[in-house]
Amino acid sequence: MENSSSSSKALLPASGSPSPWFICRMLSKVTL
């Protein structure tokens, strides 16, 4: 999961915390 976090952080803007829907999408992609 650490690798996924790094990838998501790279894609996410420097806002601080990602959006809930974005997290759900990333999790869905990882699971699928």
UniProtKB/Swiss-Prot annotation:
Highest taxon in the source lineage: Eukaryota
Misc: Completely overlaps RPC34.
Stated name of the protein: Putative uncharacterized protein YNR003W-A
Species in which this protein is naturally found: Saccharomyces cerevisiae (strain ATCC 204508 / S288c) (Baker's yeast)
